[in-house]
Amino acid sequence: KASQHVVVANELLDNLAFGIAERVEGGWAPVHIGLGLSELSLQVQQPDPALDHLTGLAPDAALSDRVPVASEARAWVADACVLARRVLVFDYAATTAELAERGQASWLRTYAAHTRGHDPLDQIGQRDITHDVPTDQLPTPYLQQTQADWLAANGMGDRVEAARQVWTERAHIGDLQAIAARSAI
């Protein structure tokens, strides 16, 4: 039974290991890193029945559309739900169908020294590789909402408006109150 604890995961799930699947004739196929003639490349494997669930999540995906397969994120959330009564997750996210439509270049990112890269095979081991989390591949949540909606529901809109008022009144003074208000906007 879950304890009375709360687990908060801020931009964690997008950093867990994930796979990539491509829509092919006959289903979905894993995409692996392989050695081409002289360099590494992303290589599409044979369709895998273990990925058939993606058809239900992205029924309109076109051939060659790719999506992340978030098995580790799903397992992490499931484990956290066993340990804690509440699990709050903040992350870049969308549905599997939305990710398929947007394309791999929009949901797969690399970073090194806070600078975004482009090719996930460039400088392997020296860059972080992240992805937008497919929410429909996670355990079904009690409540799912955008960060903006969550902040508004928890009074952030009122706080921002109050800070905006202080900034309007004190910006010309430039004191600590004005600076604090500006940082809250």
Each model region followed by its residue ranges:
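S-adenosyl-L-methionine
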Residues: K1-H5
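A mobile, often basic/glycine-rich helix-loop segment
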Residues: V8-L57, E101-A113
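Long, Lys/Arg- and hydrophobic-enriched amphipathic alpha-helices
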Residues: A50-I185
